[in-house]
Every structure is written in structure tokens, then in C-alpha cells.
Amino acid sequence: MMRIIAGTARGTHLSVPSRGTRPTQDRVREAVFSALQARGAVENACVLDLFAGSGAYGFETLSRGALSLDLVDQSQEAAKAIRKNLAANPAFKEAKLYVQPALAFLASRWVGANPNPQREQVLIE
């Protein structure tokens, strides 16, 4: 089972979709976040997690001090796991789930009448 590695939600177990995703190992996520935090790229960031799967990368950013998180995945199974994870920890209350293709989400946020490109970190896994 996956878990949050560090921060306010450290140790929180995460549900993962049973098929169609291969969650990143804890060691790999720890290395990625070590590099991001060394650059000050997580704390107070607004984060976009495309192809979110379980939401582990995005939830890790919230646990480590990100201000907000948009999770995007078109899979209903992934959305079910993410909703379960959202309910599991109050530290995740700043997250929003969008069940739609990533390109459609980007087009609706960065193209058109009301573009909203204010994201410091975009995670694509």
C-alpha cells in the first residue's frame, strides 16, 4: 500500500486504482521531492497533478506545504481512489478533482475567455 512520505499527512495510507496504474515507489517519490524541496518548489505552491492516478504526488505536495492542488485524471477508477484519499485526511481539503482528459482540462484553463495559468508546479507522471 502507498503512503505519504513526509509532512503533515506523513504515514497516511493511500488507496490506488486496482488496474491501469502503476504507483511510483516511495523511494522514487522521496528522491523527487528531495530535489523539489531543495529548490523551494513545494511550500506555498499551487500544484497541478495531471494523469493523477492515486493522487500520491499531489497529496505529497499538500502534506509538504503546497497551498492548493488540482488533480486531473480521466479514469473513473482513478477518480474513485482519489475521492477515497481525499476523504481520508483533512490535510487534503485544498485539493480539487477533475475527471476529464488532461488536454481538455488544460484547454479549458489556459485557452479561451478565462485563462488561469497560475500554477507553480505541474506534475506529469
Where are these regions (language model features)?
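Class I S-adenosyl-L-methionine-dependent methyltransferase catalytic core
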Residues: 1-124
